[in-house]
Amino acid sequence: MMMDILNTQQQKAAEGGRVLAPHTISSKLVKRLSSHSSHKLSRSDLKALGGSETISDGPSQLTFKDRYVFNESLYLKKLKKTALDDYYTRGIKLTNRYEEDDGDDEIIRLSNGDRIDEDLHSGVKFFSTTPYCRKMRSDSDELAWNEIATERFKWQSMLARVLKGDIVKGEKTRIANQVKKPGLNKELSDEIWLELKAWLNGRTMQEMEQSLTYLRDSSDSVFEEIMKFQIPQGKILSLDALEAILQDLMNRYHSVVSYWPNLKKMYKDKPITNTAEFTARIDVMNSWLNFKTNLTLRRQELDDWINRFSPISSSDNCQEDFDGVPQWNCKMKILAEQLMKEKNIESIFQKKIFYPLSPWMFKLKLHFIVYRETLTKMNIKYPYERLRSLLAFPVYLIKEVILTRLSYARKLKNPTMMMIDQMIDDFNAFIRLSVQLKYTLTKYCSNLPFDVDFDPTFENTVIEAIRYLFFLLNLKLIDSSKQNFKAPDLLLKYWDHLKNTGHYINGAETVIPNEFLKLTLRLVHKLQFYLLKQQNFPPTFANASEAEKWLSSIFENLGAMKRKLNRFSNILVKAFQNSAVYQINHNAQLVKKLKDAHYFLVYSGNTFESSGVYMFAAPELLGCDNDTILRILRNKSIGCDLVPKLDIGNNLNVYDITTKETDLNILVSKGEDSKGIPYYRVVANSSSDLDRHAHQSKKKNFSTDPFDQHLDEKNNEVFELEVALSSLGALVVLYPGEPVVWDGPVYKLPGNNLFASNEMDLGKIGNPNTLILLNQGSNYALTYQIDKFNQTVGDSVSFIEKRCSLNSIESSLQKINKAYYKLTYTVLNNYKGILGSFMKQCPGNELLNSIFMFGRDFGRSFLKYNAFSSKRKYVIIFLMVKLGMNWLKFLVEECDPTDQRTFRWCVLAMDFAMQMTSGYNILALNVKQFQELKERVSVCMSLLISHFDVMGARATEAENGMQQARLNIDTEENIDEEATLEINSRLRLEAIKTLEKTMKRNPRQMGKVLDATDQGNKYLLSLASSLSNVSMRWQKRSFIGGGTFGQVYSAINLENGEILAVKEIKIHDTTTMKKIFPLIKEEMTVLEMLNHPNIVQYYGVEVHRDKVNIFMEYCEGGSLASLLDHGRIEDEMVTQVYTFELLEGLAYLHQSGVVHRDIKPENILLDFNGIIKYVDFGTARTVVGSRTRTVRNAAVQDFGVETKSLNEMMGTPMYMAPETISGSAVKGKLGADDVWALGCVVLEMATGRRPWSNLDNEWAIMYHVAAGRIPQLPNRDEMTAAGRAFLERCLVQDPTMRATAVELLIDPWMIQIREIAFGNSEKDQVPILSS
């Protein structure tokens, strides 16, 4: 069998310790071909006749083309029946349940031929270590008799002593310490300034000085005007009018400043200009003018970005008010559509919105805080309306992006698991970005005289995204047919992401807890269903080993998932329980202690009091507003951390500044992260200030920029938590059942409609004579509040339980607790079914004993981690008592008392029975049960005594017995292989037929993207006029690779969920387009006419103003070159399979009149099923073409270089044929150069070395090829004789004698793999008639 051959060769290769990376990929194809074969060829039909033109088959003569046509149809038929990976194809239905320098490092050769040894400056003695200088030392005697040389050495020594002496050293030090040359004195500099100014004005110095004196004396009016400038109260000025007034005043001020040579002179002559108020007024007017101009520019940049991002075909003329964001909506939708195609939308927001705006937002807030009083005196307001529009823009945009993504997501019916994972990542990013925007903008406007106009539906849209995220999580974790035992880990991950969302988004504080609880409940139910299914329908096992393996897997999966779910449930319980219920023991004493502890009554306007319910607030809440009380009652902080924090990884963290950080020396610096995304960070103006500011930022949380990793906040977390905890208060809801007299302080809540929500009906929580403690803030503070309250009231109350004040959440918590109870009950009550089944099929005692041990551990886990009523506790304990008794019964009746394992199990079972019957539990047994317990314990005790090892005698005897024992196993295997294969083939064919009915095909949707009336885009219009121009909704995923002109990404078709490869070619100017247009057009022309399983599928092109997107088939397996990086392919059968697929694709190309001309491992890809695909047809040409266009590519397809003529060389030298390099007029048969390149690829697969790897450069390679030499063939250890003969036919120097791809398909080396794949049975021969 084929698989036996593959497995045997794989084992041999593994023993050799070499990499077989491609083996598993290609073996899929061989298995499919062998198992799906229905039409088979005889061995006689596949015999090769060398270079003859025909082969004989009975009376008819068959040409190579006829045989190729038949084989090709059979090959294509098998590939079309290929089963795909269900991760990409199976829909999930909603159910109810990544040059060394070879020069000489020691010797540096100079241009004049001399040499210098680098050890000259290394501190080692030069004349004793360098060979070159040792020779110089041998000539020293001759130099000593040379008078000229002696004179020069003396002069050299004298110069060295002078330059190294103290005098020269001192002068060097003095010169170095001079920071600058002596400057001109002040008087001389002023005279120069005056002389220059007089010369410029055509006056003498005396005249100029008199004029300046007069002008300085008359400048007081300008300074007084600045000091008295104020916009009249009630006068409304437009921004342009105010700008004209301020600009005129500032122009006159700057004109007056020019009367003095410098500001110091002006400050001395006019002291008023050196006052703080005057300086502040100048700064305010300058800042106002700067901010108006820059905010206008930022707005214009956003408009340009929106227009540039929209497609060429967009003809929307959106008329919007300049300062009005809602009027942006028509373009928001277009922009959102385009942003959906980008993978990382957060980086788009950072580069296009946050990065340009953040420094100006920061500076405006800083100036507002510093000059607030001056702004009030001058009655000047910053251009807040423009600021509001820029602040609100990303809010409106993210809302539109969410709505657009939701509309596409809801159109998908039964999405695949890959699509679900992609959508989960998308919505998680959208929610994270929305929360960051809401938090940052709200905080930014907290001390500004305006608020951001959030879209009224923004928060509802975010909540819809949250709901849909949980819908997707349900599909992934619950509705998938596969059991996901890592679901609790995934839930914990998204809990960490979403738990603080409700603190910022109104309405999410109840949605998120309820959705997490529903998911957890469904997971527990699914786990119980899985357990029942395994108990009621266990598989049939051939031997005890299979049964033990299956049972161990069940116990491991159940136990691990139960433990993880328990831990996650406990996290939810602790996060959601915000109240403690007490019973009142002494009503009057309780009221007195509350008054003594400075509690105050919160009067609700008789809303609660009329029902006998009274609210008291802790002294920490004294002076709070109404919203604080309502947030406690409505549990707005449910699930949040004690100090909610957001990890903002973009420049939203630069927007805000605290009121204490008013140092104008603070600067904003630029930088880039590892991905090339630009960012700003806040720094100080000097190194000393930087150190100080870095220290302060930890305390004030000023710069939380993640790029500043040196700002570590861990040392401040404990202190911050302590401060937050001590500042939190609590509400006490008293339901005494009788009137309460209160003579302490009272706080009255205004209005009577504050408690309209049903969740506020606190009277339903407890019964009369009950007290409820509601904590403020995070529910993690509840334990602290309980301890604090207990110290206050003492024994006047008794603690009952913790719970959640929201009825819906408390109900879900109780349902989860009940589900755990049912699951544990199922395990403890139904273990007998599994025990009985295994006793019949596999009566191995060790396997059966593990069932009891699993039940014991499961019950213990429930009692340890779950809270429940005493009744349910009694039921579980009683079942565990019965489990212990049955365990003892099993050991007594079924196990071998002489087996050492039985002794070990008895110890465990008796210990468990003792624990479960301890205390009053023993009384739960009736007389019969107690009697049975005593008898079984008695037998087990006897067994224990019989196994006691006295003085080591038993151990010695056992050791001797083990040395004498021998294991004799006689295994007989009698399997009908033919019947097994027949059943296997039938089942596979049925599965393929079912899959074919449900497989989705990607229709080529036609559409126009370009504006046909635009005359300035002739190249784009030419591309857009192609029949392959498509219009589809797609989204960019991960980056694959890039080159000179283009980058390749994986993408997802949002309309049907298919994975695509998108080549994105940026168009910077007309010159660039003129250069790459022929390349794009040529490759499109070739790809449009090809359709074959071994050629990458081309889907179409999408044309925009600034880029062109080419859609192709996505090959997830990577390139053949990347596989060969791990080493050669050890298994020759794998090489044969790959070569077979390469020949099939190459024969199709040549039959279609296309020559690839750049075949190499980098241009050969593998899809996720391991099928070979030819890519990169930039150098390809058709037979009817009048000219040839070429392009040199890397591992990823890339449009790169300019068009070359027909006579120029194309391809990669090490894979180029001799006739291509020499430019010979004799080209041989069609595609002969491709066959040579294919032989070089097969050679590289067999040896793991590039062809001509022993040569240094491409010129040497081309010389050897043109000289008639061929690459070194594999040795006998690397390839069989048939394989080497195949290579010799490919690497023939004369192109006219070189075999074609069709001829190579019936080479004996290919016949071998074809027979293995398709078979050679005589009864299934298919006659072929000559054409």
UniProtKB/Swiss-Prot annotation:
Q: What keywords does the record list, in alphabetical order?
A: ATP-binding, Kinase, Nucleotide-binding, Serine/threonine-protein kinase, Transferase
Ranges of residues in domain Protein kinase: 1034-1310
Q: Tell me the GO BP annotations in alphabetical order.
A: p38MAPK cascade; stress-activated MAPK cascade
> Which residues make up the binding site for ATP?
1040-1048, 1063
Active site residues according to the UniProt entry: 1158 (proton acceptor)
GO molecular function term, any single one: ATP binding
Q: Which SUPFAM superfamilies match?
A: Protein kinase-like (PK-like)
- What is this enzyme's EC? 2.7.11.1
Q: How does it assemble?
A: Interacts with by SSK1.
**Database matches in PANTHER family:** MAP KINASE KINASE KINASE SSK2-RELATED-RELATED (PTHR48016), MITOGEN-ACTIVATED PROTEIN KINASE KINASE KINASE 4 (PTHR48016:SF32)
- Tell me the function of this protein: Kinase involved in a signal transduction pathway that is activated by changes in the osmolarity of the extracellular environment. Activates the PBS2 MAP kinase kinase by phosphorylation.
Family label: Belongs to the protein kinase superfamily. STE Ser/Thr protein kinase family. MAP kinase kinase kinase subfamily.
Protein name (database record): Serine/threonine-protein kinase SSK22
Q: Which organism is it from?
A: Saccharomyces cerevisiae (strain ATCC 204508 / S288c) (Baker's yeast)
